[in-house]
Amino acid sequence: MNPMTFSLIMMTMVSGTFLVMMSSHWFLIWVGFEMNMLAIIPLLTKQHNPRSTEAATKYFLTQATASMLLMMAAIINLLYSGHWSVQKLINPMASVTMTMALAMKLGLAPFHFWVPEVTQGIPLSSGLILLTWQKLAPLSIMYMISPLTNLNILMIMALLSIAIGGWGGLNQTQLRKIMAYSSIAHMGWMMSVLMYNPNMMLLNLYLYIPMTITTFSLLMINSTTTTTSLSYTWNKLPLITMIILITMLSLGGLPPLTGFLPKWLIIQELVKNNNIILSTVMALLALLNLYFYTRITYTTSLTLFPTMNNTKITWQFKYPKQMLYLPLMIIISTLILPVSPMTAILE
């Protein structure tokens, strides 16, 4: 892609996200979402093949429908309250419609069907943007309207997302689809605590993004998209492969890695608010995510495939200059909780 075109696309996407995050007027928020959506579509079709085109079309149709629902909710609220302000979302029907629109943009169940298909059809770099940066704008709106949303609908969506994020990843061999289902599950965890403690949702987001960036960046270094090819890289780049596996276990929430911290705190917050049954079900469903990540770790590290490669480890590893952020991301993704366990008890 032409560097000038790429820079323009990235500037538009960043501007759209910041416009959404800084606006309190529904029309400007809608404009920001549209800028964001139209900017990322060229990134989804970088490879110019039918699969990327299909993924971009699915993404466009889903996001356009979500934007239509968002504008419809804003207009319904305008008719009842006379305000375009985000803080004046007082009509119950408008609140439910807005929640559905934002859930569709985030890929929350039952509006999750586009996430695995779109992620599978696009390059790893575009998948990284889709599962990290594209979550910021909808989550910022969810944060702003959290006191005005329907608790029952949020909890149903959260439970469904955690369940589907676990079940969907069980039989997958494609790493991009596994990351997509993991994203659905993480969005469910964020929604479960949104109305009780919105700052806890932000903590989960702050830890989810470095873990996802680390995993995708290491997969890009390895040029790996399937569990089978990940197994072959053990002979070539054992250190990088080992870090990928540890980061994936952190994404699954294995203690004492960083990914366990938000789950621990969210369950603690739910128990404080007398949601013991809900937190128990969520903890059990989280085991599904941990199971398929553990299975990937087992098949990759403990079952080595026969290879004709006599030189087990490459003598020289070409480290991309664009990924100088990786060491910091790896530390955040794996070692925050083991190094500073007191963060878990800070209020």
UniProtKB/Swiss-Prot annotation:
Q: Give the main location.
A: mitochondrion
**Reactions performed catalytically:** a ubiquinone + NADH + 5 H(+)(in) = a ubiquinol + NAD(+) + 4 H(+)(out)
Q: Where are the transmembrane segments?
A: 3-23, 59-79, 89-109, 150-170, 178-198, 201-221, 237-257, 276-296, 326-346
GO terms classed as biological process:
mitochondrial electron transport, NADH to ubiquinone; mitochondrial respiratory chain complex I assembly
For this UniProt record, the keywords arranged alphabetically read as follows:
Electron transport, Membrane, Mitochondrion, Mitochondrion inner membrane, NAD, Respiratory chain, Translocase, Transmembrane, Transmembrane helix, Transport, Ubiquinone
Annotated Gene Ontology cellular components are: mitochondrial inner membrane
Enumerate the subcellular locations listed in this protein's record, separating them with semicolons.
Mitochondrion inner membrane
Q: What is its EC number?
A: 7.1.1.2
Q: What topology in the membrane does the UniProt record assign? A: Multi-pass membrane protein
Q: Which family does it belong to?
A: Belongs to the complex I subunit 2 family.
Protein function: Core subunit of the mitochondrial membrane respiratory chain NADH dehydrogenase (Complex I) which catalyzes electron transfer from NADH through the respiratory chain, using ubiquinone as an electron acceptor. Essential for the catalytic activity and assembly of complex I.
- Please identify the protein, giving its name as recorded: NADH-ubiquinone oxidoreductase chain 2
Source organism per entry reads: Nyctophilus arnhemensis (Northern long-eared bat)
Top-level taxonomy: Eukaryota, Metazoa, Chordata, Craniata, Vertebrata
